[in-house]
């Protein structure tokens, strides 16, 4: 049996992103897999652009990766209580490509933030944004890494044992759904 296809998406474009670090931790915890990191560097969604030029190639690529994935992980920062604009924009674009991707695909959400809540509000916001796609969003255990600058080392490794355990439990659950 071949390794499952795992799509990993960071909702942050920032170099040194804590969410990208968290995502890499999760991918390692998931275990053997054919891993793809989704790229969400798209132009802002614009219906006129879509009408004039169609679905951008980068959007179609992410759509196809979502369609092919056996499981998906999304790590998102929290900006003003919501998911990042780039992640929301990516979901808006991908929803325009057909067929609708992620239907029935097991999906894990996680977040890392500089604040004390770890991104709980952004996870709720992301769940709402995913509703039209109808993935099987795992309901826990929650991975909401608070005070992220204090729990990753200079190499991007997650050093807090309680968060490491939460990531492992979530990835074990995700893998069991594949």
Give the positions of each predicted feature.
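Amphipathic alpha-helical interaction elements
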Residues: 11-14, 99, 115, 135
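Short, glycine-/small-residue-rich phosphate/pyrophosphate-handling segment
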Residues: 103-147, 162
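Acidic pyrophosphate-coordinating catalytic loop
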Residues: 50, 115-118, 150-153
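N-terminal beta1-alpha1-beta2 submodule of the flavodoxin-like/Rossmannoid cofactor-binding fold
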Residues: 1-97, 154-176
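Short helix/strand-capping connector loops at secondary-structure junctions
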Residues: 144-157
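Exposed boundary/loop context
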Residues: 4, 9, 108-111, 149
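Short, intrinsically disordered, mixed-charge
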Residues: 92-99, 128-132
């Amino acid at each position: 049996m071949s390794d499952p296809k795992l799509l990993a998406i960071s909702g942050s474009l920032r170099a040194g992103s804590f969410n990208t670090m968290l995502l890499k931790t999760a991918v390692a915890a998931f275990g053997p897999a054919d891993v793809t990191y989704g790229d969400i560097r798209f132009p802002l969604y614009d219906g006129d652009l879509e009408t004039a030029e169609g679905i951008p190639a980068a959007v179609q690529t992410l759509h196809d990766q979502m369609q092919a994935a056996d499981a998906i992980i999304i790590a998102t920062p929290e900006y003003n209580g919501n998911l990042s604009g780039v992640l929301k924009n990516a979901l808006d674009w991908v929803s325009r490509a057909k067929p609708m991707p992620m239907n029935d695909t097991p999906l894990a959400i996680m977040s890392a933030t500089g604040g004390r809540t770890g991104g709980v509000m952004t996870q709720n916001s992301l769940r709402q944004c995913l509703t039209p796609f109808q993935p099987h969003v795992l309901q826990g255990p929650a991975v909401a890494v608070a005070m992220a600058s204090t729990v990753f080392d200079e190499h991007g490794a997650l050093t807090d044992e309680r968060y490491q355990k939460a990531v492992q439990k979530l990835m074990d659950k995700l893998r069991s759904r594949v």
